[in-house]
């Protein structure tokens, strides 16, 4: 046996292994395997429009033909021995369910993070967005994607507080890898038709009717829709809202508009009986960093100051009515650099831990008996 040759080969293998390890960069934390008991998708809600007349299958015209639309496409994943209350995740304006999936820089998003923690997840595209594009209001026609406007890609870079284009904020929790920015830009999604508030709320309420009690996560433009859904359906057991653009108050208790350089920010008045339904469930509102503390000449940023101020008042109003409400401005608890998308920021594991702790503190993380 040629022992000298074996020793040389062993040395070469060891050197190659060392080089591979060195070139691979810092070691990546091992992730547990995602195990699912079930996954699937369905559509909920929607409307049907039927033309008058009788359909002729031999000589078809528009007569008697129908369009089903205005539904929400839902994708679900269920781990074994799942916790009692699933998490329903609602994207914001110009977004679809991708918000909650893999982050723009390729890390686990909230969908995977919380499946690993034993929660079933339901992510969906609201009517007329993403995979829910079919609309009864304009037939098959899909509106042309608008060209660049004041909220084109560079505009939303500023509006969503990644930085002041083309510069990133120092310490921002968004990857500065150019590919990550392109991935984030690509997930912007137009509506295929205008979406009345009642259509969106009806679809998500239908989702709750189908799946039963669950916690609702909202983001940005879906914030106000979440308040209305919580008021409409008692199966919404808690609402955790990331940077809502509008908050709700009982009619008669709506605070004055907050003037900003981007326009006045207003609260939405809802019937007191509906507001009381929100009083009965745990509510939390979370805002990130780089929001002006005083009036700013940059309207895209100053709007957030007004929105945060009014939503902080919503929490105070819920508490005044006896509710269980929490307001968190992340820099005030030592978490800095977050953009308008904390669920996909670089520190989204930390942001997710805040949600996990809140669910535990409110008794919403149980398995077996309870949480119904």
Residue ranges and their predicted role:
Residues 107-133:
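Conserved alpha/beta-hydrolase
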Residues 194-215:
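Conserved acidic catalytic loop of the alpha/beta-hydrolase fold
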Residues 246-322, 326-328:
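The feature captures the conserved acid-bearing segment of alpha/beta-hydrolase catalytic domains
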Residues 233-250:
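A conserved short beta-strand
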Residues 337, 341-372:
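Catalytic active-site module of serine/aspartate enzymes centered on a nucleophile-bearing elbow/loop
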Residues 26-82:
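N-terminal cap/lid segment of alpha/beta-hydrolase-fold proteins
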Residues 84-93:
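Short beta-strand element of the alpha/beta-hydrolase
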Residues 223-234:
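Short glycine-enriched nucleophile-adjacent loop
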